[in-house]
């Protein structure tokens, strides 16, 4: 989307001899600095990944471009970054580009951490995309974006220790068990990204009452408080809330 009135700069990249340009908009939201990559042909569509039935045929190009443009912008800003964090196959090419295309730059020493939210979504595509996107073109196999990140990211994580262990074996690994096993020492599970030293019902200051596995009485008091706050009818039935 075009963000009128925001600061922006032009970013140009090369993908296997093809030149691409985009605008990167910079803004702050609740004190957090945000950079948004704008490219009308790639991203101004009704849906982000598919037409409702099938993935867009140019998805490999769209998201390889996004990854390399984001890295090029990061290089141009001359800021010091602690980590580059990618999520799922859409950012997987970034791990390869960082190690291979940005070697020798100020970004080269920045570690790339890759989070797998659903290992079934891998974006497997024909071998010719390796040449077109300049992703290990010497390899004569299909291009698997997720597998590329498993190979080149410095550290891997996923949504829980249980899911991490499941991905070590088929069929949950969806064909990539060997890669997960090879990176086992660098692969951790972080339960929903939640820090239980802070978000714990036994000590959370935002709750009306505290509770834990050994003393659950406070849970009923919390339910009573939210029912009153939302002006709901008080019943003995469970309270379900969806976000």
Give names to the regions the model predicted.
Residues 1-243:
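Catalytic cores of nucleotide-sugar-dependent glycosyltransferases that transfer UDP/GDP/TDP-activated
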């Amino acid at each position: 989307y075009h963000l009128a009135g925001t600061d922006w700069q032009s970013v140009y990249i090369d993908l296997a001899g093809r030149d691409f340009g985009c605008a990167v908009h910079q803004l702050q939201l609740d004190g957090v600095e945000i950079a948004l990559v704008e490219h009308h042909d790639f991203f101004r569509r009704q849906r982000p990944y598919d037409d409702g039935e099938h993935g867009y045929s140019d998805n490999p190009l769209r998201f390889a471009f996004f990854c390399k443009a984001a890295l090029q912008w990061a290089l141009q800003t001359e800021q010091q970054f602690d980590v580059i964090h990618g999520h799922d196959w859409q950012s997987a090419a970034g791990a390869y580009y960082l190690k291979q295309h940005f070697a020798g730059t100020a970004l080269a020493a920045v570690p790339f951490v890759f989070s797998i939210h659903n290992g079934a979504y891998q974006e497997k595509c024909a071998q010719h995309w390796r040449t077109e996107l300049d992703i290990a073109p010497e390899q004569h196999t299909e291009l698997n974006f997720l597998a590329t990140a498993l190979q080149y990211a410095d550290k891997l994580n996923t949504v829980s220790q249980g899911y991490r262990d499941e991905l070590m074996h088929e069929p949950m690994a969806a064909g990539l068990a060997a890669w997960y096993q090879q990176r086992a020492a660098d692969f951790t599970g972080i339960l929903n990204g939640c820090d239980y030293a802070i978000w714990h019902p036994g000590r959370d200051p935002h709750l009306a009452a505290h509770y834990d596995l050994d003393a659950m009485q406070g849970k009923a008091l919390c339910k009573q408080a939210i029912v009153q706050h939302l002006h709901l009818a008080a019943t003995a039935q469970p309270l379900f809330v969806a976000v």
